[in-house]
Amino acid sequence: MAGTSDTNWRSYVGPADNGKLVTSEDWQAPSNPREWDDLFKCSNVSNLTATGLVIPASREDSIDCVRGNAYSFQSCVIEGSVTVKGAIDGLKLYNCVVSGTVELGQYDNYWSKGRAPTRNVSLVNCCSPDGEPIRVKLWDAEMPTLQNTNVKLIKIPKWIWLPYFLFRRLTNPKAV
């Protein structure tokens, strides 16, 4: 939402949260998840692991990660969408149930022309709750590694996303 700040249930920010392990004992989802933009927000963190969480759907994303590296979500139930952006280098969804769309390389306030794409993402032993393929959208991102995971891959052509990103960059007062 350009011009407004997101309201996030839990935010993990580097370097303070580098190396953090978030378990089901640490995590309590809000009673009103649709009143929050993102429930599990990560910004510029290295080596963050979340395991055994149930993350409900919210107004925007269950999980929203921007910048950083070596994120790992293990044995989580993700009832909404996952957005991985900001040239993240390394994110793994392992043994997760994903209800929504996984978007890789979507626009973020730190985007600039020529920046490295989101890369080294893997989905391993993941599924959707209804057995249908998990929708994975590729924007400014490299192809994820897929292992024992049924996905419907939607590659957004660069001739679509690049003008959109340039427009967002030029009109975004929060662009860094």
Residue ranges and their predicted role:
Residues I154-V176:
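Membrane-proximal basic amphipathic "stem/tether" segments
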